[in-house]
Amino acid sequence: MAVRQALGRGLQLGRALLLRFTGKPGRAYGLGRPGPAAGCVRGERPGWAAGPGAEPRRVGLGLPNRLRFFRQSVAGLAARLQRQFVVRAWGCAGPCGRAVFLAFGLGLGLIEEKQAESRRAVSACQEIQAIFTQKSKPGPDPLDTRRLQGFRLEEYLIGQSIGKGCSAAVYEATMPTLPQNLEVTKSTGLLPGRGPGTSAPGEGQERAPGAPAFPLAIKMMWNISAGSSSEAILNTMSQELVPASRVALAGEYGAVTYRKSKRGPKQLAPHPNIIRVLRAFTSSVPLLPGALVDYPDVLPSRLHPEGLGHGRTLFLVMKNYPCTLRQYLCVNTPSPRLAAMMLLQLLEGVDHLVQQGIAHRDLKSDNILVELDPDGCPWLVIADFGCCLADESIGLQLPFSSWYVDRGGNGCLMAPEVSTARPGPRAVIDYSKADAWAVGAIAYEIFGLVNPFYGQGKAHLESRSYQEAQLPALPESVPPDVRQLVRALLQREASKRPSARVAANVLHLSLWGEHILALKNLKLDKMVGWLLQQSAATLLANRLTEKCCVETKMKMLFLANLECETLCQAALLLCSWRAAL
């Protein structure tokens, strides 16, 4: 009983306080009838009905109803206070107060309009991206129709050497499917698993006119320290398997299933500007053409008495590309526009790596392959992932606890934040913009100059010590936007450097969005209209031609990776550069 009286007394005091704040003590809030507190104001005793002869009544209602009544009273009070504030601000505060209130309302309206415009732009970009994501997939796999084949070295016809690096040799190859092809290749001295240099004595070494072409390339890794077991080889050389396709390691007939460890490398999603490993398997090391001359020391002792290599190694099967970027630039001088498109392709590939949490760490013109479209325009593909950082557990943040931690393969094109890093208990190297810096250095080669980070002499720069003012100027024929972008990519501080995605968007806008950038007031709705026009034109161009040209492919990649935020960043960056000229 005492508890109930205490609660009732507290409720009465609360109501009295609320009534005093409103200035109308005779009414309860939202109910339209006098409350108990009204009697207190008139001097009446709470708990008794007004008037003579009235019977006494209990104070308040039951506890749940009392709380409901209190909640309704507070809600009514809040609504009336809000109405009073609006009335006073509009009618009682004078002209100055009205102006402030009007400006505040207009500001809120403008903010809401901007937010609605931004939401519409983001939604449009997402819809465009969804359409082109399905249309920007890589081309068909040459071995798609032979999913159960290609996992043994004996199934391939190996031709001449394509090239060699510091850890592998690459040979041209093909895989016959019909018996008549085998008969033709036997007559030319090409035997399964053997090259022309290993054919039997007395067999012809020249190819007949009907000899098959070599659409594939086989990369034979040099195994010096991995041992001879297949599982040890796959684990030691696992970085080479990062760009492997889903079926590359799923073979039968002697192929070893790769057991991916918890700290193993990531599997890279396919991208048109990144190499695909079609098959990967281990096999005995054969004596291939030029082996005794080009790399005798890494051969097993059964092939060369002084060889240090093991008897088995890893073989990777890929598409055969005509040349590397370095070889292409030795005999070709691309126009400034074509060179900008080549630079754009590298940035698209690097952006895909960053989105996947992978750093290549060995980008150079020798590790970039080139093929030509029907119009002779080069299509670039990033290859050789032997030095990549693709750890599931750390992503692009490499703990640098000691000098024994591997920072990558190419010291000349190592970004400043990597080359100047010093080990420590909490030291971390951020590779999120390191490959983009390397692309900026390769841009000099693409535009016809010597890479300033190669060679010797006064013109040679080192990534650990150079200053931006020392960077050589690109030719005047290069568009100003591209020159500014290359200098931005080579900023020493990674925080001042644009990401690969923003840099790619800068080139897209510079190449195909000139009339949008020419507008004095660049608005989102204008940008969305331009994107819709580009989408329609790109879809039409893609349907009218059997094989897309490089320009159409690049537009499709741009629209497949479309993000409103990064596109606006690129547009603002371009506008700031042009305003500074």
Swiss-Prot record:
<dbReference type="InterPro" id="IPR051511">
    <property type="entry name" value="MitoQC_Scaffold_Kinases"/>
</dbReference>
<dbReference type="GO" id="GO:0016239">
    <property type="term" value="P:positive regulation of macroautophagy"/>
</dbReference>
<keyword id="KW-1133">Transmembrane helix</keyword>
<dbReference type="GO" id="GO:0005739">
    <property type="term" value="C:mitochondrion"/>
</dbReference>
<dbReference type="GO" id="GO:0030097">
    <property type="term" value="P:hemopoiesis"/>
</dbReference>
<feature type="binding site">
    <location>
        <position position="186"/>
    </location>
    <ligand>
        <name>ATP</name>
    </ligand>
</feature>
<dbReference type="GO" id="GO:1903955">
    <property type="term" value="P:positive regulation of protein targeting to mitochondrion"/>
</dbReference>
<dbReference type="GO" id="GO:0007005">
    <property type="term" value="P:mitochondrion organization"/>
</dbReference>
<dbReference type="GO" id="GO:1903298">
    <property type="term" value="P:negative regulation of hypoxia-induced intrinsic apoptotic signaling pathway"/>
</dbReference>
<dbReference type="GO" id="GO:0002931">
    <property type="term" value="P:response to ischemia"/>
</dbReference>
<keyword id="KW-0547">Nucleotide-binding</keyword>
<dbReference type="GO" id="GO:0002020">
    <property type="term" value="F:protease binding"/>
</dbReference>
<dbReference type="GO" id="GO:0090141">
    <property type="term" value="P:positive regulation of mitochondrial fission"/>
</dbReference>
<dbReference type="GO" id="GO:0030424">
    <property type="term" value="C:axon"/>
</dbReference>
<dbReference type="GO" id="GO:0031398">
    <property type="term" value="P:positive regulation of protein ubiquitination"/>
</dbReference>
<dbReference type="GO" id="GO:1904881">
    <property type="term" value="P:cellular response to hydrogen sulfide"/>
</dbReference>
<dbReference type="GO" id="GO:0097237">
    <property type="term" value="P:cellular response to toxic substance"/>
</dbReference>
<dbReference type="GO" id="GO:1902803">
    <property type="term" value="P:regulation of synaptic vesicle transport"/>
</dbReference>
<dbReference type="GO" id="GO:0045727">
    <property type="term" value="P:positive regulation of translation"/>
</dbReference>
<dbReference type="GO" id="GO:0004672">
    <property type="term" value="F:protein kinase activity"/>
</dbReference>
<feature type="modified residue" description="Phosphoserine; by autocatalysis">
    <location>
        <position position="402"/>
    </location>
</feature>
<dbReference type="GO" id="GO:0034599">
    <property type="term" value="P:cellular response to oxidative stress"/>
</dbReference>
<dbReference type="GO" id="GO:0019900">
    <property type="term" value="F:kinase binding"/>
</dbReference>
<dbReference type="GO" id="GO:0006979">
    <property type="term" value="P:response to oxidative stress"/>
</dbReference>
<keyword id="KW-0812">Transmembrane</keyword>
<dbReference type="GO" id="GO:1903852">
    <property type="term" value="P:positive regulation of cristae formation"/>
</dbReference>
<dbReference type="GO" id="GO:0043524">
    <property type="term" value="P:negative regulation of neuron apoptotic process"/>
</dbReference>
<dbReference type="GO" id="GO:0005524">
    <property type="term" value="F:ATP binding"/>
</dbReference>
<dbReference type="GO" id="GO:0030335">
    <property type="term" value="P:positive regulation of cell migration"/>
</dbReference>
<keyword id="KW-0072">Autophagy</keyword>
<dbReference type="GO" id="GO:0010629">
    <property type="term" value="P:negative regulation of gene expression"/>
</dbReference>
<keyword id="KW-0523">Neurodegeneration</keyword>
<dbReference type="GO" id="GO:1903146">
    <property type="term" value="P:regulation of autophagy of mitochondrion"/>
</dbReference>
<keyword id="KW-0908">Parkinsonism</keyword>
<dbReference type="GO" id="GO:0043422">
    <property type="term" value="F:protein kinase B binding"/>
</dbReference>
<dbReference type="GO" id="GO:0006511">
    <property type="term" value="P:ubiquitin-dependent protein catabolic process"/>
</dbReference>
<keyword id="KW-0999">Mitochondrion inner membrane</keyword>
<dbReference type="GO" id="GO:0072655">
    <property type="term" value="P:establishment of protein localization to mitochondrion"/>
</dbReference>
<dbReference type="GO" id="GO:0048471">
    <property type="term" value="C:perinuclear region of cytoplasm"/>
</dbReference>
<dbReference type="GO" id="GO:0000423">
    <property type="term" value="P:mitophagy"/>
</dbReference>
<dbReference type="GO" id="GO:0035556">
    <property type="term" value="P:intracellular signal transduction"/>
</dbReference>
<dbReference type="GO" id="GO:1902958">
    <property type="term" value="P:positive regulation of mitochondrial electron transport, NADH to ubiquinone"/>
</dbReference>
